[in-house]
Each structure stands twice: as C-alpha cells, then as structure tokens.
C-alpha cells in the first residue's frame, strides 16, 4: 500500500513558513473551471463551490473572526495537498470501500484535473476570508496525489501562513 503524505515532512514544507491556519475539506478536490459564455453573458460556474469552500473556511475560523486573517501587504505562503478520488479499478472487485484498495498502487499518477486549476480554485475561494487577495501569496507548494485513506473519496488539505523570506 502507498504511504500517506506527511504535510510536516521536509520535502513538502519549507523552513521559511510557519503554519498558523489549516483546513481539511472532505470530497474530491474541485478544479477552477473556465468562464463560460451563455445567453446572458459571461459567467463563472464555480460560484456555488466557491461559496461552499468559503463557508468551510469561515467555520474553521469561528464566529469571533472579523476581517481577513492576513491583511493587505502581508506576504503569505502555503501548501495544498489534493488527495484525488480513486477509480473503481483501484479496488478489489471494482467495488470501492474501506480496506478494499488493491496493494502496491501508486500514490502519484498523472490524471486530470491539472494541478494549477486545483490550486487556482482554492486560492480564489480563500480571497476575502484568509487573505484580502491571492496576489499576497508569494510561495505555494501544490501536490496532487491519489487518496489512500478510508474509502478513498478524496480530500483537500490546505495550510497557510505568513511568509518569512
């Protein structure tokens, strides 16, 4: 069985960032879709998912949080680990479930969606909640792996901190 990704290991987290906020969102990671053109003009189909993400972020901050965690001018660094949902062929008998994952499967496999679109969706969802604007993000490490925990339905781990560079 593949190993779990350790977010605190030296190969994932650099010494120049000390994490102050983290979030784990269950479910298959969502990429940033491209804007679409419809009868009524241009629209962004990610609006609903973005609102759900912002609600999850606000819930972790608690009711006492007012304003953004990192105001304008504060450089931010972060780590995003996207654990992608496994396909049915990765499970014994083609039936997903806990303890049904085949042995010796790779943790990393080049699959859709693109890692940059996964990161863009998360960065945009954190706008106005964790930081004022995602232009404050000066360092970002993104890892896309296949989930190997439980039923392998996917999850996203996000850690954000002030960047000391």
Annotate the PLM regions.
Residues 2-165:
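Acidic, proline/glycine-enriched N-terminal capping motif
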